[in-house]
Amino acid sequence: MTLFQVYTRALRYLTVHKWRVAVVVIANVILAAITIAEPVLFGRIIDAISSGTNVTPILILWAGFGVFNTVAYVAVAREADRLAHGRRATLLTEAFGRIISMPLSWHHLRGTSNALHTLLRASETLFGLWLEFMRTHLATFVALVLLIPTAMAMDLRLSFVLIGLGIVYWFIGKWVMGRTKDGQASVEEHYHSVFAHVSDSISNVSVLHSYNRIEAETKALKSFTEKLLSAQYPVLDWWAFASALNRTASTVSMMIILVIGTVLVKNGELRVGDVIAFIGFANLLIGRLDQMRQFVTQIFEARAKLEDFFVLEDAVKEREEPGDARELSNVSGTVEFRNINFGFANTKQGVHDVSFTAKAGETVAIVGPTGAGKTTLINLLQRVYDPDSGQILIDGTDISTVTKNSLRNSIATVFQDAGLLNRSIRENIRLGRETATDAEVVEAAAAAAATDFIDSRINGYLTQVGERGNRLSGGERQRIAIARAILKNAPILVLDEATSALDVETEARVKAAVDALRKNRTTFIIAHRLSTVRDADLVLFLDQGRIIEKGTFDELTQRGGRFTSLLRTSGLLTEDEGQQPRPKAIAS
């Protein structure tokens, strides 16, 4: 993107407050135009002093002019600050909502730390651009447009010096931008690397402590920051050199104006006040040119940050639901997978030609070796991923034609990793249904056999669970997740190895709750417990993304196929296939 394209797209975010922004910008433009009168007034004061005429009226006018400028500037700056801060807050909220609504496949590909860093850096960059646009950008441009004609009206010869100075500034800026474009992009990449390393290390701090990696990770971060600085310093050097060149050009221009002005005054072609006024114009022009240089530098530095953010925003908008997506309602729970194919990029993993039907209220157990595609199948049902071909239907409705909100309202999921937020136990359970009363939360916790450990805490349901639930044991986290699903009361239930973190005693207590929860609900279980597989109406055995065997538990054990071999390998089935297997876990 060009600098102009980056700038105009950044300003489009202000259109939601277009009238307020317009008032602020127009006020700043008027102030910039009025400011041009200041050198003229000062020149008239010098002329009055040198000629011995009454200077008081002009002094009063100048003082009043200064007071008005100050008060007006404060009022305009205050409104600009409020607008910029407010828009930044709403942008963060809006962008966060769009990003977090993206499917997990997008987050896995993009990376959580990358998306977070891009959002935070972009919001700060946009804030700076908006603030400077309302305060100085347009006002600077207007002042430059008005300064030159006004100066030319006073004296054409001195005006050419100012025009030459402006051209020099432009060439220096263009030259330095060409020299630093790649370097600035490299700087932004290094910032992403630093942020990703910090985020990755902090989120896995327990592993780092366990393997005594603190010093090593700190050294690694130092290496990342050194690479960042090695990329940053050349860019800073070029802009420092540009600043020195601009300052030299400004000083030389002032000297030329003074020399020419002195000659013209001696020849009687100009008054001293005119020269003083022109020096004021030169100072104004230099100040505005410096602002313009800073503005261009700001846009230049912003481009690398904002281009990535705009790509992120475009990707999010491309994934937005079509306007004609309908609501999935009155779900009974019949689920059909019809010739489903899906593959992950650059791998052979996925699912291939999967077809089966789960009638309303049935329980489907999905078993198979690691990497067989069990979780992928469930993720397709929840539209974490969309299939490459085929259809998934709920009550005969293709789920690709319904809103994701209505689809997910129809499905309650208990993940292998409970996935708790750093909030209270009550808030985590209430994620299942935001409108649930405290009594309903307690009832759901009781059904999940969670009340004992909750009541044992000093703060009970107000206990903070910590980041990702790290203040609770694995079994405690899982029971909260089960309570959450119970509270949601959805017609379709997904249990992704939901009791894997529970001990035998706790599992026995939870099983009754899960069995009650499964009644009159279509349930999909990534199975790891024998009792769960035995109770299923349909068992799917997956291997390398394909359904190898399908049927009831008894049918598959009598068939003597891959499912039977898995049971025997796990020690769950003897050579006598009719013998009752021992209650152990199935490898998955």
UniProtKB/Swiss-Prot annotation:
Domain ABC transporter: from-to ranges: 335-569
EC numbers listed for it are 7.5.2.3
Topological relation to the membrane, as annotated: Multi-pass membrane protein
- Every ABC transmembrane type-1 domain range: 21-301
Cross-referenced SUPFAM superfamilies, in alphabetical order? ABC transporter transmembrane region, P-loop containing nucleoside triphosphate hydrolases
Keyword Transmembrane helix belongs to the record = yes
Main location as per UniProt: membrane
Q: Tell me which GO cellular component terms the UniProt record holds.
A: plasma membrane
Which residue spans traverse the membrane?
22-42, 57-77, 136-156, 158-178, 248-268, 272-292
Which UniProt keyword terms apply here? ATP-binding, Cell inner membrane, Cell membrane, Membrane, Nucleotide-binding, Sugar transport, Translocase, Transmembrane, Transmembrane helix, Transport
Report the top EC class in one word.
Answer: translocase
Source organism, top-level taxon: Bacteria
Which InterPro entries does the record cross-reference, listed alphabetically? Answer: AAA+_ATPase, ABC1_TM_dom, ABC1_TM_sf, ABC_transporter-like_ATP-bd, ABC_transporter-like_CS, NdvA, P-loop_NTPase, Type_1_exporter
Q: Where does ATP bind?
A: 368-375
Q: Please state where this protein is localized.
A: Cell inner membrane
Catalytic activity annotation: [(1->2)-beta-D-glucosyl](n)(in) + ATP + H2O = [(1->2)-beta-D-glucosyl](n)(out) + ADP + phosphate + H(+)
Q: Which GO terms describe its molecular function?
A: ABC-type beta-glucan transporter activity; ABC-type oligopeptide transporter activity; ATP binding; ATP hydrolysis activity
Read off the domain note.
In NdvA the ATP-binding domain (NBD) and the transmembrane domain (TMD) are fused.
Please give the subunit comment from the record: Homodimer.
Q: What is the documented function of this protein?
A: Involved in beta-(1-->2)glucan export which is required for crown gall tumor formation. Transmembrane domains (TMD) form a pore in the inner membrane and the ATP-binding domain (NBD) is responsible for energy generation.
Q: Which PANTHER family match?
A: ATP-BINDING CASSETTE SUB-FAMILY B MEMBER 10, MITOCHONDRIAL, ATP-DEPENDENT PERMEASE MDL1, MITOCHONDRIAL
UniProt record similarity statement: Belongs to the ABC transporter superfamily. Beta-(1-->2)glucan exporter (TC 3.A.1.108.1) family.
Descriptive protein name: Beta-(1-->2)glucan export ATP-binding/permease protein NdvA
Q: Which organism is it from?
A: Agrobacterium fabrum (strain C58 / ATCC 33970) (Agrobacterium tumefaciens (strain C58))
